[in-house]
Amino acid sequence: MGRAYQNKKDSMAKTAGAKTKVYSKYGKEIYICAKNGGTDPDGNLSLRRLIERAKKDQVPAHVIDRAIDKAKGGGGEDYVATRYEGYGPGNCMIIVDCLTDNNKRTFADVRVCFTKANAKIGAQNSVSHLFDHLAIFVFDGDDDETVLEALMMADVDVTDVEVENGKVTVFAPHTEYNNTRTALEEMGVTEFDEDLISFVPQIAAPIEGEDVEVMERFLAMLEDCDDVQNVYHNAEF
């Protein structure tokens, strides 16, 4: 699993667009997390760790503070998580995660991207069942057995632990994100090369020729959609 993840990381992982897109993405997520779970990071573990990831991605403090202040004020937009699934160039599988305050607008925007790429939007769970929804942590280390034992002792439902080139990669169900990170921190892990929740494809779909160019345009169009938060796929090129 680890090797497959590493090989596909650049293409299937969440897309990272321009800085403004990254700021907007984190701003929405922080706002929702603070609004639903409380605006004090000390009392909202999910918020604290989301802020840590935002800072690691060089999101300015004023963007973070503005999102939290907005949540403190109440009201504001009511964002809803929406997921679109389907098939792209070369019959690869696509998952598009959005946060929106207007489902009709978001669907229209995403549909335009699919149409221009000659891709097809499918029904819910049409492709996501062929991805593993995982919490992924990568950090320095070379002893996977010790890490696995510590996680099991902490009652973490671990999917896999692998070591390669001096890096430990821990995979766990996405619902185990907080439990896994807490257990790793208690082991003394303080720096993470990767710290995210992602959809990892169970199978790859090699694409070539014109499909590669179309796929690159398709991903760029999705990235330009304001409501799109993350894009995952199994295309290999």
Curated annotation (Swiss-Prot):
Major localization class: cytoplasm
The keyword Ribosomal protein is annotated on this UniProt entry: no
UniProt xrefs under InterPro entries: Integrase-like_N (IPR017856), TACO1_YebC-like_2nd/3rd_dom (IPR048300), TACO1_YebC_N (IPR049083), Transcrip_reg_TACO1-like (IPR002876), Transcrip_reg_TACO1-like_dom3 (IPR026564), YebC-like (IPR029072)
UniProt entry keywords in alphabetical sequence: Cytoplasm, DNA-binding, Transcription, Transcription regulation
GO biological process, one term: regulation of DNA-templated transcription
Compartments reported by the entry: Cytoplasm
GO terms, molecular function: DNA binding
Domain of life according to the entry: Bacteria
GO-annotated cellular components: cytosol
A UniProt-annotated Pfam family: Transcrip_reg
Family assignment from sequence similarity: Belongs to the TACO1 family.
NCBIfam families: PRK12378.1
Name recorded for this polypeptide: Probable transcriptional regulatory protein PSHAa1370
Originating organism: Pseudoalteromonas translucida (strain TAC 125)
Organism ancestry: Bacteria, Pseudomonadati, Pseudomonadota, Gammaproteobacteria, Alteromonadales
